């Protein structure tokens, strides 16, 4: 997914990120990468939705570092 993003294939990268989240919802960094890619593609609402899913997952996992990053990314889009 990151390789697709680097090549500018954002729609394809987003599809891959969504698959990765579906297969491994406990891997928190994917939510941030997906949210950033959605925001880059112009889908602010989609980005916020994924970031908020990640915030929920990070809280459940007790991952304070990832939670902070996700909350910061969401706040930047909301602000």
What are these regions (language model features)?
Residues 23, 57-61:
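Structural marker of alpha-solenoid helical repeat scaffolds
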């Amino acid at each position: 997914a990151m390789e697709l993003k680097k090549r500018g294939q954002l729609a394809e990268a987003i599809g891959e990120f969504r698959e990765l989240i579906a297969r491994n919802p406990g891997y928190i960094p994917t939510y941030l990468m997906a949210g950033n890619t959605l925001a880059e593609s112009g889908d602010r609402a989609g980005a916020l939705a994924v970031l908020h899913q990640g915030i929920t997952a990070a809280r459940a996992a007790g991952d304070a570092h990832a939670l902070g990053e996700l909350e910061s990314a969401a706040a930047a889009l909301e602000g």
